[in-house]
């Protein structure tokens, strides 16, 4: 999905046996009827595209190949529970310097001291956590200090991507998951955000 205020381009990889791909635009990330339905065009082997004119900022989309709707495997933002892709302008949501960010470089993999961390467990019972169980907890001074005290130089956060077994509309149910049921690999898990 590539957004501009004038139009939004949608592209999808679909297997060769796909006969038809339908794009649906929604007002909400969950529930409600489609505002617009567009038949996508096959533009290359296994690639389908559609361009929708107008400003779709804040709307949601799905692709349907006849087996149910989904946001596609390359979605980077979704509505609650990952059922629909979110149409956003990433230049407005990415933090300052995001595009220039570079990962740390180590001379050898043998130099890595890796800490595998369950995101929720890391901060959920911390009395001084402002954002217990949330991604924002990692930005708090105590979190960085704790990781430095451990002597680690790499953190493997699990789960970080959007997974399916925790209903983000019912976070008070206190369900637990290591992320072995991925839904959207390129989307942060909504249950760890401050506004799923």
Name every feature range the model reports, one short phrase each.
Residues 142-164:
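Catalytic domains of carbohydrate-active enzymes, especially glycoside hydrolases
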Residues 34-43:
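Solvent-exposed serine/threonine-rich low-complexity stretches and specific carbohydrate-binding patches
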Residues 8-15:
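Short edge beta-strand/loop segments characteristic of extracellular beta-sandwich folds
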